[in-house]
């Protein structure tokens, strides 16, 4: 019974270390994930600021476009000056479209990264839920093992109580046996002493073979 209990306790210790190790790994993964999410949200904030800057540039360009159209309607007579301004305007427009192209490429890269991030995020939480479910099952198994161990302790305690009762019974039997031996010893002494005295008086011997009589024969004569 005791070797079985030692193996049982060793198994419980290994099982509990597995539960603690699994919880520690899950906690580290959660911390790392939260740090990644914090960095990504900071990057998202910077990108939103870029979006606001781009919108401001776009509205400025639209204002220039409206002003340019006004100049077209009001200053046909200033043809040369108008074409210089138009040339400058088209340069600014080209610069604006280059900036927009760069912004769109950056936006495309950002949303690609955004999709990858949320894909990894879903995979992470799926794995985290699986780990949580595993931890919950391990804890339930650990609870069941504790209940089983408790039942074993109760059973062992009952066996010890039975063993104690058996020892008490055995002790009582020993005491009764000792009392019987004492009674037999007293009876043997009472039976042998008068016979020896009688034989001594008659000048006889203890026995033909020279050995003393047995307690049984002495009790028989008595």
Curated annotation (Swiss-Prot):
GO terms for cellular component: plasma membrane. Keywords: Coiled coil. Residues 34-62, 129-188 form a coiled coil. This is Coiled-coil domain-containing protein 70. It comes from Bos taurus (Bovine). The gene is CCDC70.
């Amino acid at each position: 019974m005791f070797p079985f209990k030692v193996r049982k306790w060793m198994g419980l210790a290994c099982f509990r270390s597995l539960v603690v190790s699994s919880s520690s790994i899950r906690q580290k993964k959660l911390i790392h994930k939260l740090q990644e999410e914090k960095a990504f949200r900071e990057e998202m904030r910077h990108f939103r600021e870029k979006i606001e800057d781009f919108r401001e540039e776009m509205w400025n360009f639209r204002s220039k476009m409206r002003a340019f159209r006004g100049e077209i309607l009001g200053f046909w007579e200033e043809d040369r000056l108008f074409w210089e301004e138009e040339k400058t305007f088209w340069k600014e427009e080209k610069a604006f479209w280059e900036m927009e192209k760069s912004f769109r490429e950056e936006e495309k890269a950002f949303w690609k990264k955004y999709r990858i991030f949320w894909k990894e995020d879903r995979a992470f939480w799926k794995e985290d839920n699986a780990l949580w479910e595993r931890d919950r099952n391990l804890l339930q198994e650990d609870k069941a093992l504790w209940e089983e161990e408790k039942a074993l302790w109760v059973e062992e305690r009952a066996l010890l109580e039975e063993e104690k009762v058996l020892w008490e019974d055995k002790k009582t039997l020993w005491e009764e046996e000792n009392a019987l031996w004492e009674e037999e010893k007293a009876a043997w002494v009472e039976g042998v002493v008068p016979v020896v005295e009688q034989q001594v008086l008659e000048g006889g011997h203890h026995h033909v073979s020279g050995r003393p009589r047995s307690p049984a024969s002495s009790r028989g004569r008595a």
